[in-house]
Regions:
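Bacterial signal peptide processing site
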Residues: 14-19, 136-139
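Short, small-residue-biased leader/transition segments that mark boundaries at the very start
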Residues: 2-9
């Protein structure tokens, strides 16, 4: 054969082979990831907007300072990125419903980030409600022991 085509094809093979991925070493069980990361970040996102009515009066909640906005955006970004971790083995429960639930949560998280970027507290509240429903629906299926908490 033609030596130039042999050289080109071997060079192409070398260029197209990706380096091996770094080893993936999960240290948190799914339950830990949910309690230590997801739940804490979701509480920040959900607590950022809303109305609290008490005997003392009405409090409208929303981020006030640039630091407040950064904190709630960081929490929303952490929620979405934690979704990626939930889709990896050994955490992924199955390839169907689990993945759909995680992707739906991530989609809600992306909407939350967009609302935060617009500083749209009404949209943040509405998306927060949808996000809560998404989380609850997943918990009802994968954590049947907590159904009584949602009655």
């Amino acid at each position: 054969g033609d030596w130039s085509s042999d050289v080109c094809s071997s060079d192409l093979a070398a260029c197209n082979s990706a380096p091996p991925a770094p080893p993936f070493k999960p240290i948190a069980e799914t339950k830990d990831l949910m309690e230590l990361v997801m739940e804490r970040q979701a509480d920040i996102v959900w607590g950022a907007t809303g109305t609290i009515i008490t005997a003392e009066g009405v409090e409208e909640r929303s981020p006030k300072t640039e630091e407040d906005w950064i904190a709630v955006k960081a929490a929303a970004v952490n929620l979405v990125e934690t979704g990626n971790l939930l889709m990896l083995a050994p955490r992924a429960q199955d390839g169907d419903r689990w993945m759909q639930n995680v992707q739906k949560m991530m989609g809600q998280g992306e909407k939350m980030i967009a609302a935060i970027d617009r500083k749209d507290t009404k949209a943040m509240f509405d998306v927060g409600s949808d996000l809560y429903d998404t989380c609850t629906n997943c918990h009802m299926h994968y954590m049947p022991e907590i159904k009584d908490l949602y009655r």
